[in-house]
UniProtKB/Swiss-Prot annotation:
It is found in: Cytoplasm. Gene3D superfamilies: HUPs, Isoleucyl-tRNA Synthetase, Domain 1, Valyl/Leucyl/Isoleucyl-tRNA synthetase, editing domain. A motif ('HIGH' region) lies at residues 44-54. ATP binds at residue 545. GO terms for molecular function: aminoacyl-tRNA deacylase activity; ATP binding; valine-tRNA ligase activity. This is Valine--tRNA ligase. It comes from Sphingomonas elodea.
């Protein structure tokens, strides 16, 4: 036994023990023949730093991993980072800009080399921070989504999907980010409410018989208008369907079409249709018989005005930024009499009607997104989604909380083709080559593509890379050695046991892992999907840098210790709810760690050391039989809570047991025994053995939540055969439950509590002793009073019980 200091330093303990665990390989102990248990971390961006959401996500995972390891399973937590195509390229480009250069000053190969250099120098920040949190990850097998083995898996998946007709090239509208110069997914678009305008325009009928009025928030897109739509049952316009209008500025003739997209109750009931720059208009255009290749495009990759295929855009507009062009076009429409003024409530006329507009922004660039018509690679997500839907319906994968199933089904049943090509330099290069006619040849190597194209056919490599989420969708099996490892269960590691994920990446990542895992492995990627909420500011607002209300988890670790932060996350994680950040609670859980530390110091001071047995000692004293039963009941409750992923219930269960039952009551109740107040030496020895055993079980049970302090106390309480991280989880043996001891000690606790309440009510000084009178006591109560005399005297500060009660007194 090593004497514990009066206070403990979390920082010193944390760094020392984490280094020990990792150096000794204790995150992956050799357990030949043990039941495999596997979880994968959502790979953080290699550019990232630990935020409070990471702290929650990884704490919950580590609790499950450590619990599984303590239960004797061959627990493996697969760890790695994501190459984060857009984010990483942005970081490196900013670094180049700061040095006075830009990406296009380099060849593609030279720029990619720069990114690899950056990763080698700066890419390990997030993994160092995960270590500070105490994450017991399999660092010896750390993966990266651009490492050689993983890249082979990505290429194989793309090529196989292409050969199966599930990857194809198509000209469709995409979310184009002009700031980044690439397509982005719907999930990377952030819609914001901004102050904008409705402009009302008058389009003249080609036959000169009148006008049709339309309204738009984007008048500049009229340069690529290809139709005006009206509802086919709208009596005002039925006679106009099939006629043409002559567009102002371009003088283009476009048809009036009947389409139910037009709402007779909204505005004039007539809608301008720009199929090359609006997702709804694209569908209207297709229904009107306009092929994608015929749809007009009026913007270049930087969202500046360009010439349309029909050459009708005036030269003076070409090259203008889209928003500058808007001003010029509105002014010209007004000058030529095609702008209909809007009249406000006071009767004043204005060029436009003020409106709040739902506007799409790129979540990384902050630029307004343009629907842009371009050739891209797509995955047939609807086909891949069908088995993924059925897997959840059948229970092959269970979603917790179950309420998220409806959201999952709704998105998967209405899923759109997945655009997987990105116009970047950093990422998995698409394995496709084109001949002079633009025909693609998809293969894992250029040699295979050339063989398919034929000798002498000149091929050019597709410059695009794959969406980062395409590669990370393979994470549950590509990290385990697929495709080189052809074992369908990947050594018993697939399917993973559970996935812990924020609900915000349910569609980005979780659903796509379901699709790819089922397609290539013929089995679900994880048996359970647990979706947690957000960590919000104390007032319930969403955290954001712009609001200045973010919380740095590393700052919280510095202030309160990693154990306190971890326990806070577990205690506050209630299924289906967000967490409100509360520093007072963090402080409270630091105090909880201090209370445990002081309890261990008390044990040392009273000759209580590490237990010599996993099994509970034999006990005769009621108080010892009681704490053994309470310990076993806590084990059973913890196992149930963790099996149900009720992290808050698990944390509360162990907290109440340690603070209240063990520290506040048991240690106080055994003081008379330990200090020899009229008890036999055998009883004191029994009590030391039971107390040491109970403290050991506490350290084991609490270890998944607070690994650092528990490991430190485990090592200091006496010699051990092994570290706590690989100890054995207590057995919930129902035979240890003892109703008679529970009744007696619960009676004692109630009696002491009543005495203390009476003392407080009567303002009795804390040090004053009171006489204890008893009336009409049963034989059982009388026996208990005698047996618990020392405990009553110490805890209630009362004298020996007298069998008479004063007149008017209570029994």
């Amino acid at each position: 036994m090593t004497e514990l200091p009066k206070t403990f330093d979390p920082a010193e303990i944390e760094s020392r023990w984490y280094a020990h665990w990792e150096d000794e390989g204790l995150f992956r102990p050799e357990r030949t023949g043990a039941e495999p248990w596997t979880i994968v971390n959502p790979p953080p961006n290699v550019t990232g730093s630990l935020h409070i959401g990471h702290a929650l996500d990884n704490t919950l995972q580590d609790i499950l991993v450590r619990h599984a390891r303590l239960k004797g399973k061959d627990a493996r937590w697969v760890v790695g980072t994501d190459h984060a195509g857009i984010a990483t390229q942005m970081v490196v480009e900013r670094q180049l800009n700061a040095a006075g250069s830009k990406r296009t000053d380099f060849t593609r190969e030279a720029f990619v080399d720069k990114v690899w250099e950056w990763k080698a120098e700066s890419g390990g920040q997030i993994t160092r921070q995960l270590r500070r949190l105490g994450c017991s990850m399999d660092w010896a097998n750390e993966r990266f989504t651009m490492d050689e083995g993983f890249s082979k898996a990505v290429l194989k998946v793309f090529v196989e999907l292409y050969r199966q007709g599930l990857v194809y090239r198509d000209k469709r509208l995409v979310n184009w980010d002009p700031g980044l110069g690439t397509a982005i997914s719907d999930l990377e678009v952030e819609t914001k409410e901004v102050r904008g305008n409705f402009w009302h325009l008058r389009y003249p009928l080609a036959d000169g018989s009148g006008y049709i009025q339309v309204a738009t928030t984007r008048p500049e897109t009229m340069l690529a208008d290809m139709a005006v739509a009206v509802h086919p049952e709208d009596e005002r316009y039925k006679a106009l369907i099939g006629k043409q209008v002559r567009l102002p500025i371009t003088d283009r003739l476009i048809p009036i079409v009947g389409d139910e997209h037009a709402d007779p109750e909204l505005g004039s009931g007539a809608v301008k249709i720009t199929p090359g720059h609006d997702f709804n208009d694209f569908e209207v255009g297709v229904r009107a018989g306009i092929k994608a290749g015929e749809m007009l495009n009026m913007l270049d990759a930087k969202a500046a005005i360009c010439q349309t295929q029909d050459g009708l855009v005036p030269a003076e507009l070409i090259g203008l930024d889209r928003f500058e062009a808007r001003k010029v076009i509105v002014a010209r429409l007004k000058d030529e009499g095609f702008l209909v003024p809007w009249t406000d409530k006071e009767g004043a006329e204005h060029d436009a009607e003020p409106r709040t507009i739902q506007t799409p922004y790129g979540d990384r660039s902050g630029q307004v997104i343009e629907p842009w018509l371009t050739d891209q690679w797509y995955v047939d997500a609807a086909t891949l989604a069908k088995p993924a839907i059925e897997a959840v319906r059948s229970g092959a994968t269970k979603i917790v909380p179950k309420s998220w199933e409806k959201t999952y089904f709704n998105w998967m049943e209405n899923i759109q083709p997945w655009c997987v090509s990105r116009q970047l330099w950093w990422g998995h290069r698409i394995p496709a080559w084109f001949d002079a006619e633009g025909k693609p040849y998809v293969a894992e190597t250029e040699e295979e593509a050339q063989a398919e194209a034929g000798e002498g056919v000149a091929l050019t490599r597709d410059p695009d890379v794959l969406d980062t989420w395409f590669s990370s969708a393979l994470w549950p099996f590509a990290t385990l050695g697929w495709p080189e490892n052809s074992d369908p269960t990947l050594g018993g590691r697939y399917s993973n046991d559970v996935l812990i994920s924020g609900f915000d990446i349910l569609f980005f990542w979780d659903a796509r892992m379901m699709m790819q895992g089922l397609h290539f492995m013929k089995e679900v990627p994880f048996k359970t999907l647990y979706l947690h909420g957000l960590v919000r500011a104390a007032d319930g607002q969403k955290m954001s840098k712009s609001k200045g209300n973010t919380v740095d988890p590393l700052g919280m670790i510095d202030k309160y210790g990693a154990d306190a932060l971890r326990f806070f996350m577990a205690a506050m994680e209630s299924q289906g709810r967000d967490i409100k950040m509360d520093e007072k609670r963090l402080e409270g859980y630091r105090n909880f760690a201090t209370k445990l530390w002081n309890a261990a110091r008390f044990c040392q001071a009273n000759g209580i050391a590490a237990s010599k047995s996993l099994e509970a000692p034999t006990a005769e004293l009621a108080v010892n039989r009681w704490i053994i039963a309470e310990t076993i009941a806590t084990v059973x409750a913890l196992d149930l809570a963790l099996a149900d992923l009720r992290f808050d219930e698990a944390a509360n269960c162990i907290y109440q047991f340690v603070w209240s039952r063990f520290c506040d009551w048991y240690l106080e109740l055994i003081k008379p025994v330990l200090q020899g107040e009229g008890v036999a030496a055998a009883q004191a020895e029994e009590t030391r053995a039971v107390a040491g055993w109970a403290l050991d079980q506490i350290l084991v049970m609490l270890h998944p939540f607070m690994p650092f302090i528990t490991e430190e106390l485990w090592s200091k309480m006496g010699p051990r055969e092994h570290d706590l991280i690989v100890a054995k989880w207590p057995m919930a043996d129902a035979r240890a439950l003892d109703p008679s001891a529970a009744q007696e000690i619960d009676w004692l606790i109630r009696l002491v509590s009543e005495i203390r309440a009476a003392r407080t009510e009567l303002n009795v000084p804390p040090g004053a002793r009171l006489p204890l009178h008893v009336r009409d006591a049963s034989a059982e109560t009388a026996x208990r009073l005698i047996g618990q005399e020392a405990a009553l005297a110490r805890l209630g500060r009362v004298d020996q019980a007298q069998g008479d009660a004063p007149a008017g007194g209570g029994a």
